[in-house]
């Protein structure tokens, strides 16, 4: 039972593989990012080993460590070994232990057999250890030597060793450096450059299960977003630039680009991060509210327009009331309440709250209470 994660982590990671196959890598990476964040959200999880020999209750094993963190660890293994060795190793593990029980050591032996690599270092810290790296990344440029030094400091108590990707952006081009971080407090890596790099970006694909603190200017976040090819760097750039929107031109440029991003989760995140008065973004928001192919994005865009309290959007809100999407319907009703409160009662009374989703109900409740729509209030 202590090795429960050997089963449950694959259940978690199978979802990643399905999302990757069915919906594409961006969607799979988004779900993985959210899954790992959910695991980290409970501070108790940091102190739990993945393989636990001491637990108070069998049911305690069904948690964000056995599932979410375990799935993230498998993803690291896949990327360290490569697809061919990883999946061949899994095949060997299944055949070798067919009709029997499985333990983490047996998984390690199969992966070592196929890959030819010693994986004790990996399993000792990730399967039989707790926590994850908490890093502080800083860089300094030496103009005389034409070198940049990247300092990676581990601030957690138990130190890890791991491979780490570092992107160096120079003259608009990314050079990816692959380094090995040893299990000590500080590691320095020196790279030859022609000038002070525009950006240093550690763990650009979010492959390493970690928390990384790295100060970046709005301009650097804009460069990170516009040069990144993966979801993680784009998504986190949007998140980190949020507080500078409408205050810094590079943050504004980043959000203007994100509202047009090909991946809908990035468009949605940008909409959610807009300030209360999004004047310079309204043209793009209107297009999303009218034409976006994803109802979640369309609904969020309508929600942004509702906050402007501009009556010119009333036809758009009234059209949205008839949408199938709960997001579009709920935000449209909120918009009507803002610009034409005399109409909101009539529209709200026609919505069937019994069959409505929880999200729609939560959106509508403030409108119902504020406007005293008695027909939708419980007796």
PLM region spans:
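Non-catalytic accessory/interaction domains
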Residues: 84, 97-283, 293-294, 298, ...
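Solenoid-repeat scaffolds in large eukaryotic assemblies
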Residues: 86, 344-345, 377
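Structural detector for internal amphipathic alpha-helices that build alpha-solenoid repeat scaffolds
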Residues: 208-210, 232-246, 257, 265-278, ...
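Hydrophobic alpha-helical and helix-loop surface patches within well-folded domains
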Residues: 1-152
């Amino acid at each position: 039972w202590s090795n429960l994660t050997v089963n449950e982590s694959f259940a978690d990671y199978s979802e990643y593989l399905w999302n990757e196959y069915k919906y594409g890598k961006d969607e799979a990476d988004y779900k993985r990012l959210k899954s790992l964040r959910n695991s980290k959200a409970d501070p108790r999880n940091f102190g739990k080993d993945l393989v636990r020999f001491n637990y108070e209750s069998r049911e305690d094993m069904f948690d964000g460590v056995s599932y979410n963190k375990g799935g993230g660890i498998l993803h690291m293994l896949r990327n360290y070994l490569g697809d061919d060795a990883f999946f061949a190793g899994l095949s060997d593990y299944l055949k070798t232990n067919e009709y029997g029980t499985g333990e983490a050591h047996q998984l390690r032996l199969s992966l070592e057999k196929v890959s030819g690599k010693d994986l004790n270092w990996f399993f000792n810290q990730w399967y039989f250890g707790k926590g994850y790296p908490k890093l502080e990344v800083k860089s300094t440029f030496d103009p005389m030597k034409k070198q940049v030094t990247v300092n990676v400091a581990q601030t957690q108590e138990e130190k890890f060793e791991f491979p780490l990707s570092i992107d160096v952006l120079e003259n608009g081009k990314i050079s990816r450096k692959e380094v090995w971080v040893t299990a000590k407090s500080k590691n320095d890596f020196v790279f030859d450059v022609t000038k002070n790099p525009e950006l240093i970006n550690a763990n650009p694909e979010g492959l390493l299960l970690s928390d990384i603190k790295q100060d970046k200017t709005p301009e650097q976040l804009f460069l990170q977003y516009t040069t990144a090819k993966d979801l993680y760097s784009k998504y986190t750039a949007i998140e980190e630039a949020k507080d500078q929107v409408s205050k810094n031109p590079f943050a504004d440029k980043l959000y203007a680009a994100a509202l047009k991003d090909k991946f809908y989760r990035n468009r949605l995140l940008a909409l959610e991060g807009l300030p209360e008065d999004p004047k310079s973004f309204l043209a793009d928001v209107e297009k999303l509210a009218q034409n976006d192919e994803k109802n979640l994005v369309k609904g969020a865009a309508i929600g942004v327009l509702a906050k402007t309290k501009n009556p010119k959007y009333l036809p758009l809100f009234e059209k949205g009331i008839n949408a199938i999407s709960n997001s579009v319907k709920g935000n449209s009703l909120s918009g009507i309440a803002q610009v034409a409160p005399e109409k909101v009662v009539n529209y709200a009374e026609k919505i069937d709250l019994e069959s409505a989703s929880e999200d729609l109900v939560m959106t509508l409740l403030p409108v119902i209470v504020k406007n005293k729509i008695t027909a939708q209030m419980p007796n």
